[in-house]
Amino acid sequence: MKERIEKCEDIAKRMRRDMVEMSKYCGGDAHWGGAMSCTDALAVLYGDIMNCTTEDLEYGARDRFILSKGHNAMALYTALVETGIESPDTLEQFQQDGSIYGELAIMNEAHGIECSGGSLGLGLPMGVGMALKAKREHWTGKIYVMTGDGEVDEGSVWEAAMAAAQFQ
């Protein structure tokens, strides 16, 4: 257990270091507070809990992560690098013209980005929809959603929560 904790702590440290490095490419213009605050959770999910290796990105056995609070995309990008889904040099593309690694995540399943971010309250409904599909198609993978405090008052979040409870 101690080794698993230390592994996740090391991942989180590298993710934070990488986010600071990424600031060189965007002139420091990033959503630092949110990105730094979710780093530990992402380090545990991607480093210890989720099944999301590069070999199984296309299959129903892999787990999926939806970052509903899209302004924290830089934390997601560093988690994808830590998992090996993306290479470290992709971080240099953060907020560059023509890059898929913008300030807000843009859906690109081939790169481990399951959902576009930025519109408040859309991540949980998308996650519930994915979970329903997974249940119907007998996927073994799990769906994880990270929401932000700014979106919990959105009606779509409450509708999704009620639907998730109803459909289990």
Model-derived regions: residue spans:
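N-terminal hydrophobic or amphipathic helices/low-complexity stretches enriched
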Residues: M1-M15
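Cofactor-binding active-site loop characterized by glycine-rich and histidine/acidic residues
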Residues: K7, C26, M36-F167
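N-terminal capping segment at the start of a domain
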Residues: A12-D29
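N-terminal glycine-rich anion-binding loops that anchor highly charged ligand groups
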Residues: R14, G33, S37
